Amino acid sequence: MSRKRKREPEPAMLTLAGIYEKLADESEDQRLRAAHSLLKDFEPRSTSIDQIKVIITRLFRGLCSSRKAARLGYSVALTEYLIELNVQRGASIENGIPASSIIDILDNETTPEGNNSGQDERDHYFGRLFGAEAIIKSNTLVKQQDLLQWKRLLDLICGIANKKPWLKQECGWILYECIKSFAANEPSVPDDFALAVVEKLTAHKLIRTPEGLAIWLEVSKAFPHAKLPKDVWKHRDPLSKKDITLLADVLKDAKSRTNSDEEEHKSQGKAVWSVQLHFAWDVVLARLYSNELVNGKHIQKDHKVITLSVFWEKAVEGKISHKCLFYSS
């Protein structure tokens, strides 16, 4: 009786296996070479849609590795591959892969299984965040003008921020940088994409957080015609004089005031304490400074908005004094 010969792996599979291995290499140079090889040997225009889906699935899965080097390598490769997919296949669903399929793969490959360890769950949430960032950087959803899938991706990011508070600042930073990127590419980016970020943060009760504050300020500056929600900040401006106490509380990552109509917007959990100053402080201080500086002179343009000195007195010195009294009592 003759034995069946083992089926030899196809050359393409062997090539991909080598690329995946090098994407996880500790050497940044090796990782970049591997990403370049992936784009060269399996460029989207000459690769079947089925093969492209297999590659994208493997890249998303690689983001869930416990090795930092692997997450970095797979993240770069995924971002660049999605960019090339847009360029070579175009934004049309007929030629490329619909945004819904890409979000499906992200969701499926980065969902931790029920019986997994805490470390494995942590790795999967990191993978989900890195994957979401890769999709954002590739501009796939904007190019396909798929607002529905954009909102779906925002739900995934907000879900990470609420479920894992120690990732909340990273989630906010990715969305803040996304709004800045939108602003740089305006008017090709519709206001609806920027507005959706604010709306989803509001829906997930993350708008009155340092991250939500920074994003709101950036959206209001970059997309002045976007109709922001009315019931979050007075006059739709976090720097309104009437909101100075709330502004100070948010910047300290404290719970916001709990009047009946404000309870819905209170901060959801505190982020892990860090000696590093939150990026929202830079955003607020820069906005206050630019409000006062006109033609090289300090001029307050809007009397309804707080000045830098008032902010410093109420939000910084006031909080410090309050803490000193608390600890000395």
Model-found features: residue ranges?
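Extended alpha-solenoid scaffolds built from HEAT/ARM-like alpha-helical repeats
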Residues: 2-329
